[in-house]
């Protein structure tokens, strides 16, 4: 079943790239969402729907996939965000085909149980993102593309060395995750392996100062917001630290933990500070994403079960509300021709539905209780406090700042006087709005249900690091 979930969007994406109608892509995105909703609702715990087949058996490489509670949650949020984008983003069929292809590669990344296969999906998921930027981006897309590729190469080569070292230096017979965990690295080897992983994953989180690719990536991408929403979903560094880097090299992590905690807190505060000064929605959301990923990383780096669980939940939730805000920004651009904050005012008068959706998405971003951002932020800060009270305080300041920049942007755009004449939500946009709000409410009101598969993983993670029961 997990293989079907990975292949379904890839097949529909390939059909769209061959020139079939865009409506087929909406159907494919909808079917993918329904399938992943079913997989999440029926997930029995543990690693379900496991699939394993030899790829290069002589080299110890296997097509190995499985769905645990963590990957099941990400399968759901990724498929939901792509479906929402397919509903409302006015893009041509081939663009949507690239989006579906990227969805399938992201699902493969989150389900991979073989380290080398994970590396392949980790890198392959970049290809559709690069093509969307190159083919459909703005005037400065070439520079943004070069920056993106440069940072990717800086992380990719050390990561490949770490992947090979994790097996060869440990004596594991295969690249399968369970075999690697059963053959722990020696302390010196663990440091170098972790360093290779950490560089790549810090770029893809991203953490300050390895975030320079992020603002131009969003600013120059297609104004529909679909590529930006997918870029939000590709911020997989926190997941990769939790799934691979830290469990495979805990001694290496222990040597770098203090620095990583500091960089995570700094990323949270720096991102919030720059977002407050942003003049357009894409820049605001890019730096807000940096800030939220810093908070999520802080939770995982704390090594506590609360922090890890909160950081991962925040990562999943942010894909929905940040992705939703990028798509909303695309709707604003279609109506006004600009993304500049304050350029259009008083939108709530002529577009109350659009304004209500924006308010709920922004409130989820700032962590209002009852919406999806709150449970992850609360648990993350709780876990971070146990590891470092003063760094948790810095992260808390970023949460306060998020309310300032988000609500200020909302006020300038929707609430101040200035008859805008912008039309309200219509047609499929109402479906986008209702599904988004429903997801934000359910994840905020019933976090225990959505995070039911995270708790045992977070406990095992903390126990590995000496912080669990």
Curated annotation (Swiss-Prot):
GO molecular function: NADH dehydrogenase (ubiquinone) activity; ubiquinone binding
Enzyme Commission designation: 7.1.1.-
Main subcellular location: membrane
InterPro entries xrefs: NADH_Q_OxRdtase_chainM/4, NADH_UbQ_OxRdtase, ND/Mrp_TM
Stretches that traverse the bilayer: 1-21, 23-43, 47-67, 69-89, 91-111, 115-135, 144-164, 190-210, 258-278, 284-304, 308-328, 354-374, 390-410, 430-450
Catalytic activity of the protein: a quinone + NADH + 5 H(+)(in) = a quinol + NAD(+) + 4 H(+)(out)
Membrane topology of the entry: Multi-pass membrane protein
Key word Iron present: no
Location(s) in or outside the cell: Cell inner membrane
Record-level GO BP terms: ATP synthesis coupled electron transport; electron transport coupled proton transport
Gene Ontology CC terms: plasma membrane
The UniProt record lists the keyword ATP-binding: no
NCBIfam families with a match to the protein in the record: NDH_I_M (TIGR01972)
Family note: Belongs to the complex I subunit 4 family.
Subunit structure as annotated in this protein's UniProt entry: NDH-1 is composed of 15 different subunits, Nqo1 to Nqo15. The complex has a L-shaped structure, with the hydrophobic arm (subunits Nqo7, Nqo8 and Nqo10 to Nqo14) embedded in the membrane and the hydrophilic peripheral arm (subunits Nqo1 to Nqo6, Nqo9 and Nqo15) protruding into the bacterial cytoplasm. The hydrophilic domain contains all the redox centers.
Protein name: NADH-quinone oxidoreductase subunit 13
Organism: Thermus thermophilus (strain ATCC 27634 / DSM 579 / HB8)
């Amino acid at each position: 079943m997990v293989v079907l979930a990975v292949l379904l969007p890839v097949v529909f994406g390939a059909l769209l790239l061959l020139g079939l109608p865009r409506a087929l892509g909406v159907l494919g995105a909808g079917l993918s969402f329904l399938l992943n909703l079913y997989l999440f609702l029926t997930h029995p715990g543990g690693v379900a729907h496991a699939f394993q087949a030899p790829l290069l058996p002589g080299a110890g490489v296997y097509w190995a996939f499985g769905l645990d509670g963590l990957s099941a949650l990400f399968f759901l949020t990724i498929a939901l965000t792509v479906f929402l984008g397919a509903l409302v983003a006015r893009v041509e069929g081939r663009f949507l085909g690239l989006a579906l292809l990227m969805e399938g590669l992201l699902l493969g990344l989150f389900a991979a149980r073989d380290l080398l296969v994970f590396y392949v999906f980790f890198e392959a998921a970049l290809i559709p993102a690069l093509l969307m930027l190159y083919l459909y981006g703005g005037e400065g897309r070439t520079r943004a593309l070069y920056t993106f590729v440069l940072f990717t190469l800086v992380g990719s080569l050390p990561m490949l060395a770490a992947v090979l070292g994790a097996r060869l230096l440990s004596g594991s017979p295969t690249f399968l995750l369970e075999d690697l965990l059963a053959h722990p690295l020696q302390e010196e080897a663990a440091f170098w392996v972790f360093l290779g992983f950490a560089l790549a994953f810090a770029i893809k989180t991203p953490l300050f100062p390895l975030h320079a690719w992020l603002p131009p990536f969003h600013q120059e991408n297609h104004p529909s917001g679909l590529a930006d929403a997918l870029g939000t979903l590709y911020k997989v560094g926190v997941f990769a630290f939790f799934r691979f880097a830290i469990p495979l090299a805990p001694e290496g992590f222990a040597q770098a933990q203090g620095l990583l905690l500091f960089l995570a807190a700094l990323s949270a505060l720096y991102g919030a500070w720059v977002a407050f000064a942003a003049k357009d929605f894409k820049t605001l959301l890019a730096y807000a994403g940096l800030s939220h990923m810093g908070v999520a990383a802080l939770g995982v780096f704390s090594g506590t079960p609360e922090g890890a669980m909160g950081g991962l939940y925040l990562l999943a939730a942010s894909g929905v509300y940040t992705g939703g805000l990028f798509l909303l920004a695309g709707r604003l651009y279609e109506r006004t021709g600009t993304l500049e904050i304050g350029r259009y005012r008083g939108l709530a008068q002529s577009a109350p539905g659009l304004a209500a959706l924006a308010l709920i998405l922004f409130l989820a971003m700032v962590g209002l209780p009852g919406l999806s951002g709150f449970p992850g932020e609360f648990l993350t800060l709780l876990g971070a406090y146990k590891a470092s009270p003063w760094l948790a305080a810095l992260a808390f300041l970023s949460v306060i700042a998020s309310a300032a920049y988000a609500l200020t942007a909302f006020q300038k755009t929707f609430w101040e006087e200035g008859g805008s004449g912008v039309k309200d939500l219509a047609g499929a946009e109402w479906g986008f709005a209702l599904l988004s709000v429903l997801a934000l409410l359910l994840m905020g009101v019933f976090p225990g249900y959505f995070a039911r598969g995270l708790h045992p993983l977070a406990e095992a993670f903390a126990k590995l690091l000496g912080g669990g029961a």
